[in-house]
């Protein structure tokens, strides 16, 4: 983490009232933009090549009926700050009008580095696919996120770094996942409180997974009551009937494709498959 990832000071911000906006709010230059109010149907789009942009969500509520409520198309880095005592929200719908190949595919979608910090709260309801998706590096720094997603809760390609904070994720896919299998794809957590309920993997890393400390409550695939059954049943005349009810999708509690290191922490895991894999 860098110094600016911890910085939550709001200086020289350009204030934007979303109540006065219609359609998309476009950010094309470096700077700090403080958003408040409600955008009933539109997106905040960052298209600022090689610029560092800070977006302050000050009780901001963004709804989009046809795309991502927040879309970072290009930037050197975007920092989203949630000021103390504020509660903001992002909400999309079940369909986007954009071509899927052109993206986006999450309520908060970034093609470049993204940091979310500040002790405020961000509530995300993703009815299309993912809650948060970052195609570069995502850093979550001592913040509060509540995510409900039709697919993955938090999906990151290159690296995900989490330092402190509170994270509640309910996902029909993976809870928190990194995807870059060829290089990077690491997931690192240093403290924080996590409540994850996922139909697939709770926490999944395509690379190394390192947890220094934290409190984790993870339910995957409906929990251990929906167990994987790969045994054989005794039939009349002493014969066994082989049957396989193994899940087709991965439904593990905490999973790493490479190395997994857990230094400290409290773990309560109810998983359809392996608790740790």
Identify the residue ranges that each predicted region occupies.
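A composition-driven surface/loop motif
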Residues: 1-277
């Amino acid at each position: 983490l860098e110094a600016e990832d911890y910085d939550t000071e709001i200086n020289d911000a350009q204030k934007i009232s979303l109540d006065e906006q219609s359609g998309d709010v476009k950010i094309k230059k470096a700077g700090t933009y403080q958003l408040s109010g409600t955008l009933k149907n539109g997106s905040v789009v960052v298209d600022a090549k090689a610029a560092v942009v800070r977006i302050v969500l000050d009780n901001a509520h963004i709804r989009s009926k046809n795309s991502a409520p927040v879309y970072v198309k290009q930037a050197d880095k975007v920092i989203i700050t949630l000021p103390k005592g504020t509660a903001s929200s992002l909400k999309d719908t079940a369909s986007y009008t954009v071509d899927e190949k052109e993206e986006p595919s999450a309520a908060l979608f970034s093609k470049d580095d993204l940091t979310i910090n500040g002790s405020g709260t961000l509530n995300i309801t993703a009815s299309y696919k993912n809650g948060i998706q970052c195609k570069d590096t995502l850093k979550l720094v001592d913040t509060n996120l509540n995510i409900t997603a039709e697919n993955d809760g938090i999906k990151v390609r290159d690296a995900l770094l989490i330092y402190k904070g509170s994270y509640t994720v309910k996902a029909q896919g993976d809870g928190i996942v990194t995807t870059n299998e060829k290089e990077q794809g690491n997931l690192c957590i240093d403290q924080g409180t996590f409540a994850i309920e996922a139909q697939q993997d709770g926490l999944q890393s395509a690379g190394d997974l390192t947890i220094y400390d934290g409190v984790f409550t993870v339910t995957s695939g409906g929990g251990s009551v929906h167990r994987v059954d790969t045994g054989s049943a005794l039939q009349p005349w002493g014969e066994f009937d082989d049957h396989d009810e193994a899940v087709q999708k991965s439904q593990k509690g905490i999973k790493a494709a490479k190395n997994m290191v857990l230094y400290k922490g409290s773990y309560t895991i109810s998983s359809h498959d392996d608790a740790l894999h």
